[in-house]
A protein has these predicted regions:
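Domain-level signature for soluble enzymes in the chorismate/prephenate branch of the shikimate pathway
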Residues: 1-381
């Protein structure tokens, strides 16, 4: 057979496969009906294991692993379709609930607003807020929770908080507070972070014994700190550490903060750009009490809890794969008061209102114990 004949044979096989696939997916509705009548869950692990083992044993040895992969994917798509059908029978699907909850705006993201930030003048959160809003009216709070409370109580319309760094990882406290306050993300920003060693005018590097800054900044500058034998002390905020050094009577202390803090607090930039990586970015999010969705929103954040059993997270990820949804980020956090149980945060490359997102929301009921929609938004680069 020449290549043209081989391709013609493959086309015929693919047509047969397609027809069989459609027939298999169509029968998923009948499976769902039977499971409803019998009071059975969509996911039957014992049946699935038996089926996969049986199919693998019937496949030629060289195709055993591929057979399991193929049919596991088919089963995942079938379960997603079964769950979608069951949700439709309930009268309102998860995606419909998300649409009903979210407030879609036809107007662009606001240029000015009252915004809560953690820290004091010169904080990176302030710099981020000024990039996210043209004319923000900023109120400062000492803690991340203070920012959350200001938004909850209506003192500020939005809050701006750091959520992850390219070097030091996630800001876990912010993830925990998002779940605690049930707030929503309406915008995000990737901000280039350049850390500087700030001292009182005239101080030499050899005189510095102790450096103060936020824990994330200390982690991002670990190489410099260790290389110079400095003792690092955590402080609530980078700008607050600069203010503290400026007001201190000690001359052997320094702060790690933004260059703008030097001018604000009368300090000197002793060493610029001391972060370990030049590719040092922090991602900030704008939080709101309402799940506002502004035009152009193309990123979606979810929180899911699963059963505390082997394979529980895999079954969720399986649905993303089956529906061809790109997972940008996955973060796990322990559930307070529940030993060795976790909640999972997902960032998806998936616009609000898209069929892919709706299909996902309507198909994960059976593989998660709880589900929270954190919002759909645009990330500013």
């Amino acid at each position: 057979m020449d290549l043209a004949d081989i391709r013609q044979t493959i086309d015929g096989i693919d047509t047969t496969l397609l027809n069989s696939f459609v027939e298999r997916m169509d029968i998923a509705t009948e499976v769902a009906k039977s499971k409803i009548e019998m009071g059975k869950a969509v996911f039957d692990p014992a049946r699935e294991r038996f089926k996969l083992n049986n199919l693998a044993s019937r496949a030629p040895g060289r195709y055993e692993a591929q057979t399991i992969t193929l049919f596991r994917l088919l089963m995942s798509m079938s379960k997603a379709e079964q769950q979608r059908y069951i949700n439709e029978l309930k009268g309102i699907t998860v995606s419909q609930k998300a649409h009903a909850t979210a407030v879609a705006f036809d107007t662009p993201f606001p240029q000015t607003a009252t915004v809560a930030c953690q820290g004091v003048e010169g904080a990176y959160s302030q710099i981020a807020a000024c990039k996210l809003f043209n004319v923000p009216d900023i109120a400062f709070f000492e803690t991340f929770e203070g920012v959350m409370r200001a938004v909850r109580d209506g003192f500020c319309e939005f809050g701006v908080l750091p959520i992850e760094n390219s070097t030091a990882g996630s800001v876990n406290a912010v993830y925990d507070l998002l779940a605690q306050f049930d707030f929503h993300i309406v915008r995000s920003l990737r901000l280039k972070i350049d850390h500087n060693l700030l001292v009182k005018p005239g101080t030499k590097l050899a005189e510095v014994r102790e450096v103060y800054s936020h824990g994330q900044a200390i982690a991002q500058c670990a190489g410099f700190i260790e290389g110079h034998g400095l003792h690092a002390t955590k402080y609530p905020n980078t700008a607050m550490s600069a203010e503290m050094v400026a007001n201190s009577e000690r001359t052997d202390v320094a702060a790690i903060a933004s260059r703008s803090c030097a001018a604000l607090y009368g300090l000197e930039v002793l060493e610029p750009n001391i972060q370990d990586s030049d590719n040092n970015y922090t991602r900030f999010v704008v939080i709101s009490r309402e799940p506002r969705v502004y035009p152009g929103a193309n990123r979606t954040s979810l929180m899911i809890t699963t059963a505390n059993e082997p394979g529980a997270l895999y079954r969720v990820l399986e649905r993303f794969y089956a529906l061809n949804i790109n997972l940008i980020k996955l973060e796990s956090r322990p559930i307070p008061g529940h030993d060795f149980e976790f909640m999972f945060y997902f960032d998806l490359d998936c616009p609000f209102g898209s069929k892919a997102l709706d299909d996902l929301l309507d198909s994960i009921d059976d593989v998660c114990e709880s589900f929270t929609y954190f919002g759909s938004y645009t990330e500013v680069l």
